[in-house]
Amino acid sequence: SDLEILYRILTGPAGGQLMSILAADSHGNRIARAIAWLRENYARPIRIEDVAERVGMSVSSFHQHFKAVTAMTPVQYQKQLRLHEARRLMLLERLDAGTASHRVGYQSPSQFSREYARVYGLSPARDVEASRESMSTAAE
């Protein structure tokens, strides 16, 4: 049964570590809450101090634990969320790059294009065109 599996996991060799991660007040739980908040608020301007305070951590501890969990800084994580959502908007909702970039929180279209190309390897327009071509080829 599911309860038996859960019992065996929690009483096994990694059980203590897993329990500390799942503990309501653990760093892992606080980072999970910060990630959930960032996912809902990625388009807003954020201050790391505010996010750290929101989850009850000092800025330095928040940075350290966030990077340990995500392998990136909170700002890099927000940027990745914004770029991913902008790409989704351009591909699926057929928004142009300027509209998509503004909707996900970028103030500068040129900054958006630079960061997009750095992550996806192409300008937004070329990436969307190439992605649509590969989707139509795959559908044939």
What feature does the model see in each segment?
Residues 2, 6-10, 14-46, 50-55, ...:
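A short, Lys/Arg-enriched amphipathic alpha-helix from helix-turn-helix/homeodomain DNA-binding modules
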Residues 8-14, 39, 45-81, 101-126:
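Basic/polar phosphate-binding segments, predominantly the helix-turn-helix DNA-binding elements
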Residues 119, 131-134:
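Short, leucine/isoleucine-rich alpha-helical interaction segments at C-terminal helix-coil junctions
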Residues 134-140:
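C-terminal regulatory/oligomerization modules of transcriptional regulators
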